[in-house]
Every structure is written in C-alpha cells, then in structure tokens.
Amino acid sequence: MEATTAQANELERRVDLSIAIADVEKEMEQRLKRMGKNMKVPGFRPGKVPFNIVKQQYGDQARHEVLSEELDRVFGETVTEKKMRVAGYPRIEPKTTESNSHLEFSAIFEVYPEFTPGDLSGSEVERPVLEVSAAEVDKTLDILRKQRVSYADADRAAAKEDRVVIDFTGKKDGVPFPGGQANDYPFVLGQGMMLPDFENAVEGAKAGETKTFDLTFPADYHAKDLAGQTVQFDITVKQVQAPVLPELDAEFATSMGIADGDVTKMRAEIEANLKREVKRRIEGKLKDQVMEALLKANPITVPVALVDMEIQRLMQAARQDMEQRGMKVKDMPIQPEWFADQAKRRVTLGLILAEVVKTEKLQASPEQVRTMVEETAQSYEHPEEVIRWYYAQPQRLQEVEGVAIENNVVEWVLSKAKVTEKAAVFDELMGQKQ
C-alpha cells in the first residue's frame, strides 16, 4: 500500500492510494475458499464445490468487498497518519494507470477547518433587565380568566368582546356565492374571525335585528374570484352574549391546580412561573446576541459535506412535522435550497462552539446538569418524577448537557464582550400584543 496527499483548496484534500493487485487477489482467493465451504450446488457435496464454480458465481462480489475494505483501511491509515479530521465521506475515483501490479485510486474529501477562536473584546451585548411586579401577575390573571370566559345573553347592542350568533347570506351581482352562507354562526367581535368591515356591520346590532350592507373583499383575499370584489350581505342577529369572566376566588384557584383553593398561593405560583419564564426569555435574548458575536468574530469556511448533511436532516425534520400535522408530503415537495442558509449557519455555529468549548475547557459538570434538571422539574406538578425521568435515559441527560455547555459558552462570551443593561418591557419580552 502506498499513499500521497495533496491540498486542492482551503478544505478539500485529495489522497492518492495505490493498492497491490496481488494483495487483493490473495485475500479474494481466501474469501472465496471460505465461502465455498458453505456453498451448496446440485451434484456436489456440501463444501466440495470446485473453486472455479465458486469464483464464477461469487468472484465479482468477493472482489468488490475486498477492494472496498482495502480502500477503507488504506484511507483510514493515511488520514490518521496525516492527522486529518475528515468531514463527511470521501469520494473514491479510479485513476488511469499503466501499472500491472497496482490499482490506483484518488480519494477526494473535505477536512474540518482549523482556527483559533476570534477576539470578542469589541463585541457588544445588551442584557435585558426586568423584575416581575404585581402588575404582571394581575395581567397574567386577566389572561387566564379570559381563557376561561363564559357568555350570557345580553339585551343590548353587540359590542367588542361579545359573542354573537348570526345567519348570513352573501350575494355577488344578486346571486349567492359559494361559502357565503351560514346559519347559527357564532363568533366573538374583535377577535378577527371575520373581515373588519363585516364585524363593524354586526357591531351595534341587537338580537332579532336584520341588516343589509355592502362589503369589498381585500385585493389579496384567498378566494381569487372574490378578491377586490364588492358583494352584498344580508344578516340576522339571533343572539348577543356578553362575556362573563370567572371571579378570582377559591373555585378559580382550584381550577388552576391549587388544591386548597388559596388565592394567595395561586398568585405566588403564577409569580414564580413568570419569573422562570422571564429568566428563560432573557437568557434566549442573550444567547441570540452571543451567537451573532461568535459568527462575526469567526468568519470560517465550513465543509460543504457537513452543510449538505444538515440540509438533509432539516428536510427530514420538516417532512415529519408536516406528516404530524396531517399534511401529505408528496403533494408539497420540499426543496433543499429552502434550508441552505439555516443549515450553513447551524454547521458554522456548531464548529465554532466546539472549538471554543475545547480551547476554553467549558464542558458541563454533573452538578451543573443536575441543577438544570431540577430547575426544569420545578415547573411540573411532581418534580421528583420528572428528575427520575431525565436520569432514566442517558440520551435525555446528554440533551441537557448540550444546553449546559451552550450556557457555559454564553457566560464565557459575556465575560469577554462589552455588556450593557437595558430595562425591558414585559409585553415585548414575552412577545405579547399590547
């Protein structure tokens, strides 16, 4: 066996491999003899099949297997000797040669980039600061009450947040159009279930009232035959129901999982949950900025092979997600280019994070993993069961360990970067509409 190496570009390498034909033929003969011992051919006793018949039937298979194994061995020895970190799989190409004693091949592959983590002293990170107040607890309670709203008949004109039940018929040029009719149709005013002009026409009407009005569909309306068209609706309001929010009492507290119905305990639990969520959101904001800082400080070239593999992984995840949603994947072809940028970013960050962790020794400790598991478990009704669930499977702990390592990297970057604090607005941080 002989091997030479060459550098094609920044990450691509070529290894020229030379394999002795005699070695291949020798191993091939030994393999065929072993196969012949178990071969059954009519007219011959088991294990007594002539070698030429064994070779005729299995020679090509044996030669392919031996050559493949020899190439793998020679390639592995070469890259190990040269201390090359191979990214992906090599492409093996036969070479034209006049040699009668050797088979010549080229293995083309990529290697991992070698780099030293860049300087982060000039990076700027903004740390959101927010203390959960009684006002946030009250606002959360209001949201929870609205999620449990009931409705009662109201003898008045319909207003926003009321639920109305109507019959309606839509006509275009005096003719009812498909999808434009319904009876006993309920919806809540102000939730955007109907077009704004439709809701405006219903608002102010009382039960038993009938109205006729014109409505122009938006130019980008999903039904192309109605987009931009003006139609006429006839409606009859059958019910107007006002929202009734549950009282903040023991019954409500019990419905929220407080066994003894203690409202004070309920508020304390909501506050604790909000603090955990605020902490998680702030950590997420910091992490996003840290990752951007790492990308900016480390403009590395990444192996195309790794990006292609990540694209395939993302495509498979997208297919599974679509299937879980009841969608037919075959009817919605997924294109690799949709995931190219995301895949390249993920691969780049993965390589940078791995190098930072190795260089700065930022591996997660068992104590750190345990703390994270316990913190996660606190948001469940039976924390001890959740902790046992995590420790029952090594893979679950590995996922937590991965997050812990990322947290270590975030803290390390924050120790190097210029960090300024900025007061955060609760609704903005939580992604809620004001």
From Swiss-Prot:
GO cellular component labels: cytoplasm
InterPro entries, per the entry: PPIase_dom_sf, PPIase_FKBP_dom, Trig_fac, Trigger_fac_C, Trigger_fac_C_sf, Trigger_fac_ribosome-bd_bac, Trigger_fac_ribosome-bd_sf, Trigger_fact/SurA_dom_sf
Catalyses which reaction(s): [protein]-peptidylproline (omega=180) = [protein]-peptidylproline (omega=0)
Principal localisation: cytoplasm
Every PPIase FKBP-type domain range: 161-246
Classification via Pfam families: FKBP_C (PF00254), Trigger_C (PF05698), Trigger_N (PF05697)
Entry function: Involved in protein export. Acts as a chaperone by maintaining the newly synthesized protein in an open conformation. Functions as a peptidyl-prolyl cis-trans isomerase.
NCBIfam families linked to this entry: tig
Similarity field: Belongs to the FKBP-type PPIase family. Tig subfamily.
Protein name: Trigger factor
Native source organism of the sequence: Dechloromonas aromatica (strain RCB)
